[in-house]
Amino acid sequence: MTEALISAALNGTQPELLAGGWAAGNATTKCSLTKTGFQFYYLPTVYILVFITGFLGNSVAIWMFVFHMRPWSGISVYMFNLALADFLYVLTLPALIFYYFNKTDWIFGDVMCKLQRFIFHVNLYGSILFLTCISVHRYTGVVHPLKSLGRLKKKNAVYVSSLVWALVVAVIAPILFYSGTGVRRNKTITCYDTTADEYLRSYFVYSMCTTVFMFCIPFIVILGCYGLIVKALIYKDLDNSPLRRKSIYLVIIVLTVFAVSYLPFHVMKTLNLRARLDFQTPQMCAFNDKVYATYQVTRGLASLNSCVDPILYFLAGDTFRRRLSRATRKSSRRSEPNVQSKSEEMTLNILTEYKQNGDTSL
């Protein structure tokens, strides 16, 4: 017992939250929750990286879409909404970074905790659906270029984007009920990334429904679109075509995001919830610890899409790279006259000072 207390103090954990433990409650007996030291360093490190790169990348993307990408194409509408979802999410990361550096002691209140988890899930499933829209848009443009001319208009993309936002907010709204804060035995405050044990059974059902309808089905649609896109690129005469290049980039980037960020997160989240519900025997505690630790890793990976998406705009967007280069050149040209005028002003001031002092050697 003494060794457990010392280990808990060194790792910033509670005795009842040590790995591999077996806790006896008033009514039930179950494996104790894992709270290992790596979580306090891995997650904030990942979130700092995502915040810096995601904030800069999505700020530039939004600036480009608003000021330099007019008039928008249909795919630009989807990409702007994707950038907006990512930008809103990265704005919430500083509070989460502090939370983990503070040994997961939440100080911002229950409402902010609910909002934090709500925005994460809105970004997660909003990004998945907007990537699906982008993929379907590219599929129709490559595989059915003539039939899709009317369907790819900007107005239709605006309608679809509005529907996506409404759908995501409606589906994710229950998170505002399930998430929240809780008080640990040592009086610190936790901000649940899923939910408290008392709501776990119903949350598992809700989580499975969102996984199927907001992840699995869009992923199947994307795989189908990309399979047909690759087939069209192979059999159609699109050599050296910008559309061919952008389509290849789109396939590679989106599939990478799903393979690295979305798929591992949903698999491990489901397994972790199932372990909390049904794998509560002494023989399963060590397995549960590994599941929980892996789930924490995938939580960090799930946030990486917010800093990867700007690469998608740059490589697969309509004229994004060319217009970004043009915008930066314009900015540099505007700064050159300012530098020159400042230099002339400094020279004039120096000459005036010398003349006032009676020095005419210049």
UniProtKB/Swiss-Prot annotation:
Gene3D superfamilies in alphabetical order: Rhodopsin 7-helix transmembrane proteins
Predominant subcellular localization, coarse grouping: membrane
GO biological process: cellular response to purine-containing compound; phospholipase C-activating G protein-coupled receptor signaling pathway; platelet activation; regulation of cell shape; relaxation of muscle
Transmembrane domains' residue ranges: 41-63, 77-98, 115-136, 156-177, 204-226, 250-273, 293-314
One of the record's GO cellular component terms: plasma membrane
Topology within the bilayer: Multi-pass membrane protein
Glycosylated sites: 11, 26, 102, 186
GO molecular function list: A1 adenosine receptor binding; ATP binding; G protein-coupled ADP receptor activity; G protein-coupled ATP receptor activity
Intrachain disulfide bonds: 31-285, 113-191
CDD domains reported in the protein's UniProt record: 7tmA_P2Y1
Functional note: Receptor for extracellular adenine nucleotides such as ADP. In platelets, binding to ADP leads to mobilization of intracellular calcium ions via activation of phospholipase C, a change in platelet shape, and ultimately platelet aggregation.
Protein name: P2Y purinoceptor 1
Lineage: Eukaryota, Metazoa, Chordata, Craniata, Vertebrata
Gene name in the database record: P2RY1
